[in-house]
Regions:
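Active-site-proximal alpha-helix that buttresses catalytic centers in soluble enzyme cores
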Residues: 1-132
């Protein structure tokens, strides 16, 4: 086992969406988090989901839970297609507030999904399915 692997900080990923009053919408984020959890074994130790508003867990709750499970570094991913006020201002402010209680924890906020060839594949897949 490499030294880097032995001493790597325990990392958590929090996937954040807007949140909805519709259970089905919130359940989709749970499923995404489960899929990511299965795909990133060995790279990310803890995977959580959170909502900006309208549903639980909140960003603060997911941050606190990650720390309680031993996270030393937290990566927050805004699960949004495009950059905007939520991903550029609201989520960073909410994460900063949550992190205040845990000054020993480092955190990073990723870019939203954005433009990526795999997004195009998903769009085309949806078009083909709609055409049937």
């Amino acid at each position: 086992m490499s030294t880097e692997k032995m001493y790597r900080k325990k990392r958590a990923l929090i996937i954040v969406d807007h949140g909805s009053s519709f259970k089905e919408a919130n359940d989709m984020l749970i499923e995404i988090a489960n899929m990511v959890r299965q795909s990133c074994k060995g790279e990310i130790d803890i995977v959580k989901h959170a909502h900006m508003e309208l549903a639980k867990p909140t960003i603060s709750e997911a941050f606190n839970a990650s720390v309680a499970e031993g996270a030393e570094e937290i990566i927050v991913h805004p699960y949004f297609l495009s950059p905007g006020m939520h991903s550029k201002e609201d989520i960073p402010n909410m994460v900063k507030e949550a992190a205040r209680k845990h000054p020993h924890i480092t955190y990073t906020i990723t870019e939203p999904l954005g433009i990526h060839p795999k997004i195009i594949d998903v769009v085309l897949d949806r078009v083909v399915k709609a055409d049937r």
